[in-house]
Amino acid sequence: GVFILLSWLPTTFAFAQQNEQQKDTIQKLDEVTVSAQQILGSKFQARNRTGSAYYISPQEIQKMGYTDINRMLKAVPGVNVYEEDGYGLRPNISLRGTKAERSEKITLMEDGILAAPAPYAAPAAYYFPNAARMQAVEVVKGSSQVQYGPFTTGGAINMVSTAIPTKFSAKLSASSGTNSTLKTHINAGDSKKHFGYMVEYLRYQSDGFKHFENKQNAGFKRNDLIAKFKVNTAKTEGANHSFELKVGYADEDSNETYVGLTQSDFARTPFLRYVGSQKDHLTTRHTQWVGTYLLQFSNRLKFTTHFYYNTFFRNWYKLESVKY
């Protein structure tokens, strides 16, 4: 009985060691998506990027459920934000200690295209892409963002919009909250052998948490419409050609102001708006046309060309000064 026990133990030990070795040799690699609209494409690419980079994945965005870009970016190291309107409509973002006002010292992009109204001349971001319709957010800092825009000391943020799906899919989400806050998000798309499309609409509105003494609200309304169309050749062993056209329209109507409160009024009623700012009103309109040609020879070699045209209109009527 003792001999049998001793002879069985080495066999059992060898079998367990072999299983452990097999488990150690199996490594699951993160999926890498080749896209002309993304800088990183995955957390794996972000970890292996020269310099500092961070990738907020679609799964993370879905789990967060935020419409405010400020909240999304709080998990990213080296990013500082300060609130202005409480909804992230005009965020103030600082990367690595740069000036945060209007995010004017960072490079802001959507799908790899400069999104600020005048990124080289007047980069103050009075327009910021709606975070609620994004599927990913990419942040690159330091040396890793030199190639993307005029600001090389801070970093760049690339907002990745909803991609054309590989098969038919449709999504409808609606939510409501306090202060008559409503959000409706709809998108649908499909891809065939040589053609694909995606249409998306976002409506976001609220009466706001501030109010006048006459109970008039200080809220906003936003509309955002995006359409994408893509044609491509068959994926053979040779070069693969594709062309994608993206058309977008966005507008905003808000009762926003620069006027604050005195210290005593803030301590008594922090959400009060002075009647002098009752006529303050902001309207914006943004359109975009983006054409992307991609010539892909392999997973390591591709040629990308972007053609884009953006327009931005802004009228902000606001109280300038009060004399008494």
Segment roles from a protein language model:
Residues Q37, G142, V160, S173-N179, ...:
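Outer-membrane beta-barrel pore domains and translocons
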Residues K215-K221, E256-P270, E320-Y324:
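Flexible, surface-exposed loop regions and adjacent strand-edge segments
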Residues N70-P117:
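Extracytoplasmic beta-strand/coil segments of soluble accessory domains associated
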Residues E31-M64, L89-N92, I106:
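N-terminal periplasmic "start-of-domain" segments of outer-membrane beta-barrel proteins
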Residues S176-Q205, E213-T257, H281-S298:
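Transmembrane beta-barrel wall of Gram-negative outer-membrane proteins
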Residues I113-K141:
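Short acidic/polar hinge/loop motifs at secondary-structure boundaries
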Residues I61, L73, V137-E138, I157-M159, ...:
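Non-catalytic regulatory/gating segments with a bias toward low-complexity or hydrophobic composition
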